[in-house]
From Swiss-Prot:
Cellular compartments per GO CC: endoplasmic reticulum; endoplasmic reticulum membrane
Gene: pgap1
Protein transport keyword on record: yes
Side Cytoplasmic, residues: 1-4, 617-672, 755-821, 880-887
Function: GPI inositol-deacylase that catalyzes the remove of the acyl chain linked to the 2-OH position of inositol ring from the GPI-anchored protein (GPI-AP) in the endoplasmic reticulum. Initiates the post-attachment remodeling phase of GPI-AP biogenesis and participates in endoplasmic reticulum (ER)-to-Golgi transport of GPI-anchored protein.
Protein's organism: Xenopus laevis (African clawed frog)
Glycosylation sites: N75, N155, N230, N362, N397, N432, N444, N482
Pfam families to which the protein is assigned, alphabetical: PGAP1, PGAP1_2nd, PGAP1_3rd, PGAP1_TMD
Family: Belongs to the GPI inositol-deacylase family.
Gene3D superfamilies to which the protein is assigned, alphabetical: alpha/beta hydrolase
Residues exposed to the Lumenal side: 26-595, 694-733, 843-858, 909-927
Protein name stated in the entry: GPI inositol-deacylase
Gene Ontology annotations of biological process type: endoplasmic reticulum to Golgi vesicle-mediated transport; GPI anchor biosynthetic process; positive regulation of ER to Golgi vesicle-mediated transport; protein transport
One GO molecular-function entry: phosphatidylinositol deacylase activity
Length: 927
């Protein structure tokens, strides 16, 4: 082991561990509360047709109910609005309980004017995120469920013609996949709400069925956007707390024709303002309440079904999930208002104004003239805390209505924040108005405050350049806010990349003033709905983890902003500095799943170096030394960078397509905004370190197991070279092939791996035993001790070597074989690891069927079984004189390049490329 390599790879591994720690542990504690219920949940199974039950014996459809509602609906005389819940990966149909219970309580609160019937599908908790072979089957079953659900409403006055769908995780993707079915009518679905659904790409592209399913669904929605424009889509992500599905994957693929789609992060959802993990997004009370309110507002009061107007539906969704004006949606049409008699106005001519009520107040109207303010100021900003009225700010044009009897309700421009309602009105937009009117209702025993000011946006905007990524947090940018304003806007310059991450500290100092109101911050990303909103504390500075879920679009010049709704009695200071650990976390969050690609690429380079050393030196190099020699990023990355660059030219693209080569994965990642120039370099180095230390760890495991093997069964014969193909090889190949064909391909590969491991253990134990035995005999001979004990030991040892006394050359040849077998074993291990998702799925369904169908690894497993069985009996001496050895050694570099080029988004291709690499070795054994 080279000490420098060990130290370097250790440091790299520590950096990777820091990134992993940031992803899995460095997020805010959950601010979600549990939903609660008053009655025990009941799930009434809906009887499906015999044909459907026969085709999908593992799937079921249920209707949710509680108490008297469940009893009333036992005969399935339904009168509500149908909503279908689709669970996701390993999800239970009982996850519908939280939303269904809240919806039932809300229906009771409004006197059951209308209500929802919540249906839920039992997918048998299938692991569809790991195995894509059952996604089409689930999609077809959901289609049958929708037809069955709608048939239950035939006797209604206004029977529903469509179903609203709530899909969690992969259930949301299944909902979108319904439209790809040949005989599916798009009118059967009007609203789809997905929760933590990876829409753009699979989290793990473990098999071809999964990637093909994604390609089919996304292409259909892009190419048929006009046809699907009446479908209202909402995708809700969990934020940084959801480390299983990062939020960037949940953003819906956009199209200029499909405008009825919206993607938000739960931390930006009004009233929720909390990040959720992958499971809590289903039961988070704050988010469930918002979802329930939105669905109730989607109902048309005349038909008591979901509104058929897609624009109205989208306005409802945006009202609840983007910007909540603290007003009921049902009064949206009331833009204008009027007074029957002239109210008593109080004229306010100051640029700053505060009104505080501690106990009681009379109804008041405050009039703010605009004419003399338009020159010096650009905006009128107001904040109120605990003022419980929906309409509180109006506009008046005294030219049209001299006594301001006709007014415009401007409260729709209000934004609801955690402890306040704020409004920021641009004076140029309201050039037709002469006055703003502030309405204070009569109160008794209420305590609230209202603060308003005219401000200049330019004077209140602070431009702060972010610190460089490589500053490692040693430098920072400061923005002291020493004036007594209500609103400040801090614009972060050059903050647009996904690999950027910063700590933003906000210090608030109110001195001795203990009665100051709260200050609120909003970290706003203008090109996606991923805002972070919170309240400042007087005791400790607030730290905001400023990073992006989505990269800035190419033609978007807007800047990331921090809005600070301040208390005028307090001083504030904003400091921003680079967070190195969060940068590593962003790299791992966006690209960590691609690590197996770079690990295998490094192993193939090291494997090629070993074959080359056999060709040149006649002996096999140690695997850890071969990493030092061959695992260099400049051998792989430049080729990919050049290809990616040339693909921008039409002539090269035509040549590429003429060779029928698949799309370069880096090009696709760049198109999604998930790639940056040094990503491949970083992960190649990470892959080298993992491959290096995993090889050392595997060697240590082999040593420990071999010691146990020697203790249990001491080898008595020195292993001799044998033919690559024997009757035993035929028998084992047929046995493992039968298992692969009748059960699961990865299961057979796991058995082959264990068989190969036993082969390596036997070889290592034999070499270790004979090396130690020879050393012991030499020591006894040189010392010339004639004690009885020594003589007896020597006789015993000599008897063990009676049949064959190995020479140093034979032991050296065995050592070379072990080095080569160990590398092949390591590659075999990664073949098994990459196939584990389908193996886990097969284990879960083993009680229903013994055969995995379809099996993504069956054919490749059959090929690999034959290859590995031959390689088990191969030796380095057998390939030294091979005419194909040089070709096999040279081709490992192109193979490693191909692994990175085409395996990043298609992990299942890696096993096939490893199989081809090992096949070249097999050829060397015979040619």
């Amino acid at each position: 082991m080279n000490p420098l390599s060990a130290v370097f790879n250790s440091v790299v591994l520590v950096l990777l561990a820091l990134g992993v720690t940031d992803v899995f542990f460095s997020y805010e504690s959950s601010r979600c509360s549990m939903t609660y219920m008053f009655e025990y949940p009941q799930y009434l199974q809906i009887k499906l047709s015999k044909k459907v039950s026969r085709l999908y014996p593992l799937y079921e459809l249920y209707l949710y109910g509680e108490g008297s509602y469940a009893e009333e609906n036992k005969n399935l005389t339904l009168t509500g609005v149908p909503v279908l819940f689709l669970p996701g990966n390993a999800g239970s149909y009982k996850q519908a309980r939280s939303f269904a219970s809240v919806a039932l309580r809300k229906a009771e609160n409004i006197g059951n004017r209308y209500h929802f019937n919540i249906f839920t599908v039992n997918f048998n908790e299938e692991l569809v995120a790991l195995y894509g072979g059952s996604l089409r089957r689930q999609t077809r079953f959901v289609h049958e469920c929708i037809k069955t659900i709608l048939s239950l409403y035939k006797n209604q006055t206004f029977p529903p013609e469509s179903v609203a769908i709530i899909g969690h995780s992969m259930g949301g993707l299944v909902a979108r996949a319904l439209f790809t079915l040949k005989h599916f009518k798009p009118d059967l679905i009007n609203v789809i709400i997905t929760q933590a659904t990876p829409h753009i790409l699979p989290v793990l592209s473990t098999d071809i069925y999964l990637t093909d399913f994604y390609t089919m669904v996304n292409n259909y929605w892009i190419y048929n956007s006009l046809k699907l424009r009446n479908i209202t889509m909402l995708s809700v992500a969990g934020g940084y707390s959801d480390y299983q599905v990062r939020s960037g994957l949940t953003f819906l693929p956009t199209s200029s024709f499909h405008t009825s789609a919206l993607s938000v992060v739960s931390s930006a959802v009004p009233i929720t303002w909390a990040s959720t993990d992958h499971l809590s997004i289903v039961w988070c009370r704050e988010l469930v309440l918002v979802t329930a309110r939105a669905l109730f507002d989607l109902i048309d009061e005349h038909t008591k079904q979901i509104n058929i107007d897609p624009q109205s539906r989208m306005s409802v969704i945006k009202h609840h999930f983007v910007r909540h004006p603290a007003k009921h949606l049902e009064s949206r049409h009331q833009i204008t208002a009027s007074f029957t008699e002239t109210p008593k106005f109080t004229l306010v001519e100051d640029s700053k104004w505060t009104y505080t009520v501690n106990k009681e107040s009379n109804e008041s109207f405050f009039l703010f003239p605009l004419l003399d303010k338009r020159i010096a100021y650009s905006h009128f900003h107001c904040q109120n805390t605990f003022l419980y009225t929906h309409s509180w700010i109006f506009g008046c044009n005294k030219t049209v209505s001299p006594k301001c009897l006709q007014i415009n309700d401007l409260s729709w421009e209000t934004e609801l924040l955690p402890s306040a309602k704020v409004v920021n009105l641009k004076l140029d937009v309201y050039s037709n108005l002469s006055h703003f009117i502030l309405y204070i209702p009569a109160t008794n025993g209420s305590k609230f405050s209202v603060e308003c000011e005219f401000l200049s946006e330019e004077a209140r905007t602070v431009h702060v350049p972010v610190t460089h990524v490589l500053s490692f947090g040693f430098s920072s940018s400061h923005a002291p806010l020493n004036s007594s304003g209500l609103l400040y806007v801090i614009q972060f310059e050059d903050f647009s990349k996904i690999y950027q991450a910063f700590n933003v500290f906000i210090v608030r100092n109110c001195g001795q003033n203990k009665e100051s109101k709260s200050s609120i911050y909003k970290f706003h990303v203008p090109w996606s709905h991923e805002d972070l909103i919170g309240v400042l504390s007087d005791e400790l500075p607030v730290r905001i983890s400023a990073k992006l879920h989505a990269e800035q679009p190419q033609n978007d010049n807007r800047l990331v902003k921090l809005f600070l709704y301040a208390s005028p009695e307090c001083l504030h200071e904003v400091t921003i500095s680079t967070s190195f650990s969060q940068i590593l976390g962003q790299i791992v969050r966006f690209h960590g799943i691609y690590l197996p690609v770079y690990i295998v690429a490094n192993l193939l380079l090291a494997y090629g170096a070993q074959l080359h050393s056999i060709l040149i030196q006649g002996s096999c190099m140690d695997l850890d030394l071969s990493f030092d020699v061959a695992a260099k990023p400049y051998k792989v990355d430049p080729v990919l960078i050049i290809c990616k660059y040339l693909l921008n030219y039409k002539w090269f693209k035509n040549y590429w397509d003429g060779l029928m080569l698949p799309q370069l994965d880096a090009v696709q990642l760049h198109a999604y905004g998930f790639w940056f120039p040094l990503a491949s370099l970083f992960f190649f180095i990470f892959g080298t370190s993992i491959a290096y230390w995993s090889s050392i760890g595997l060697q240590a495991a082999v040593r420990i197991l071999s010691s146990l093997w020697i203790y249990l069964k001491r080898p008595s014969m020195f292993p001799k070279e044998s033919k690559c193909i024997t009757y035993r090889v035929y028998a084992e190949t047929l046995f493992f092939a039968f298992i692969s064909w009748r059960s699961c391909g990865t299961f057979s590969l796991l058995l082959v791996f264990l068989r190969y491991l036993s082969k390596v253990l036997i070889l290592y134990s034999s070499m270790k035993n004979y090396v130690s035995l020879n050393a012991h005999i030499v020591k006894d001979t040189s010392s010339k001790q004639d004690s009885v004990k020594t003589d007896s030991d020597t006789n015993i040892n000599s008897n063990q070597l009676t049949h064959h006394q190995p020479s140093s050359l034979e032991i050296k040849a065995l050592d070379d074989c072990l080095k080569m077998h160990f590398t092949i074993l390591h590659l075999n291990l990664w073949i098994v690891l990459l196939g584990l998702p389908s193996f886990i799925y097969w284990l879960k369904t083993l009680r229903y069927t013994i055969q995995l169908d379809p099996d993504p690894n069956r054919v490749s497993a059959l090929v690999l079984i034959f290859i590995l069985e031959i390689l088990m009996n191969s030796t380095t001496s057998a390939i030294k004189s091979s005419v194909c050895l040089k070709t096999a050694a040279v081709l490992q570099l192109p193979l490693s390049i191909i692994v990175v080029a085409f395996g990043t988004l298609h992990l299942y291709r890696i096993s096939n490329l490893i199989a081809f690499s090992l096949f070249l070795h097999v050829v060397c054994c015979f040619v």
